[in-house]
Amino acid sequence: MSYSRSMYSSSSVVGGSPYRSLSSAPRFAPGSSAASVHAGPGGSGARISVSRVSSVGSGFGGGFSGGFSGVSNVSLMGGAQNEKETMQDLNDRLASYLERVRSLETANKELEVQIRQHTEKKGPAKDWSPYYKAIEDLKKQVFDSTVDNSQLVLQIDNARLAADDFRVKYEAELAIRMSVETDIGGLRKLIDDTNISRLNLENEIESLKEELIFLKKNHQDDVNELQAQIARSAVTVEVDAPKSQDLGKIMAELRAQYDGLAQKNREDVEKWYQSKVEEHTMQVNIDTQELQTSKNSVTELRRTMQSLEIELESLRNQKASLEGTLHDTEARYAMELEMLGGTAMARESELVQVRSDCQRQQQEYQALLNTKMKLEAEIHTYRRLLEGDSFDLQDAVPTVTTQTVKKVITTTQRIVDGKVVAESNDTEVLKA
């Protein structure tokens, strides 16, 4: 943000020299040889009497302090006067003129010496082009720093967006992990139920085995008892009856029948036990495979989560580092910008001062030059008087000119965040 402020000042220049003038000696144009000159103190209030001129008026100035002032009336009256007195008066007046010319020449030499000393003291104008180059380089550095800051801000925004994406992925993976852990809990409960069922079946198998052993033992006892009874019975009865059945054969048949029944029951029990064992073994294998798969998934998810946490932590550290770097860079460039602004303001102030000094020196030089020209004109006029040449009274009267000079001072200030970081003053002289 910048704005300009202008201040105007004006000054009047009389005779091309502001506030300073040197008075010149009175200059006259005698009309004929029969003339008388009467001079007042300082060259003002002079009277010249000429027989053929009716009246002439002119203004003269005296001293080195003010403008041309002290206007006197010159009356030329006709009449015959004594030639000797006239020549005496003219010689006296001419002597005073010569003395005045010598004093003016001395003053002119002193002014030339002062001008030469002032010029040598000031020296040549300072070359500001190296500062312009340095200012351009600093502006380029500020621009490059601004671009670097923009890139850093963009990188920070990208890192923030990437961190947000990783956070979303982490939350999604965490939800999947929780669901998998829930499934694992259900599978563990199912495994526990399966183990309990397996233990119950094993207990049933053991009880069936014990029952089978008990049945075999009872059967063997019954067979032994029947065989003992058959052996103890030794009675032979001979009757006329049909041929009796063979008890041994019957017992063998019964034994074979019971053996077949027991074998069949054993086979049925073994088949049922084998089928149950195979079924539960298959279920256990399936559950074991699912559990292993779930464990692998959980391990992979845990590994992924750890890698994501590590990457998230690294991104957070990188973000903190970039933010610290950005803060330091902003502080450093703000300090450098403030220093550059102060340097630029100082250079602009020096430039304004140099311009003002140049203008003042130019005005002083112009005033001295005008004074020198006036003195040379007066000396030339005195020489013409000494040589006896005639001249118009209008040539002897100095031309008083008034010139108005208007100065326009433009102050430009650059404001950043409410602070003035740069200020420049530009002075322009307008001659009316």
UniProtKB/Swiss-Prot annotation:
PTM notes: Phosphorylated. Proteolytically cleaved by caspases during epithelial cell apoptosis.
Organism: Xenopus laevis (African clawed frog)
Site entry (Cleavage), positions: 240-241
Spans annotated as Coil 1B: 135-226
Region of interest (Linker 12), ranges: 227-250
Domain IF rod: 83-393
Region (Linker 1): 119-134
Chain segments carrying region Coil 2: 251-388
Role according to the record: When phosphorylated, plays a role in filament reorganization.
Biased composition (Low complexity): 1-21
Note: There are two types of cytoskeletal and microfibrillar keratin: I (acidic; 40-55 kDa) and II (neutral to basic; 56-70 kDa).
Region annotation Tail: where it falls in the sequence: 389-432
Segments passing through the bilayer: none
Protein name, as recorded: Keratin, type I cytoskeletal 18-B
